[in-house]
């Protein structure tokens, strides 16, 4: 695995997520590969969840705006992507 082998998967950095008309707030499946033990997920620097490595976390984005999504593992490795919600 490359150095710092923890990687967010399924979300591209810079992606724009659009709400479907008057539909429900968009939800993203937050998932990472290469982590050890427990993964800590942060949204704009605030912790939103802890899950065992290999498990996904569902996150709803109720408000439009820019979001920074970060994942960290117990070994101190991390990955980060930025998305926009419209």
Give residue spans per PLM region.
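Soluble, non-transmembrane domains of envelope/secretory-pathway proteins that act on or interact
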Residues: 1-86
């Amino acid at each position: 695995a490359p150095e710092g082998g923890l990687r967010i998967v399924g979300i591209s950095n810079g992606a724009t997520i659009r709400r479907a008309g008057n539909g429900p707030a968009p939800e993203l499946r937050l998932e990472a590969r290469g982590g050890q033990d427990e993964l800590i997920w942060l949204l704009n620097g605030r912790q939103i969840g802890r899950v065992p490595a290999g498990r996904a976390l569902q996150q709803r984005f109720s408000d439009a705006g820019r979001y920074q999504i970060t994942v960290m593992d117990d070994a101190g490795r991390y990955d980060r992507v930025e998305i926009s919600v419209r």
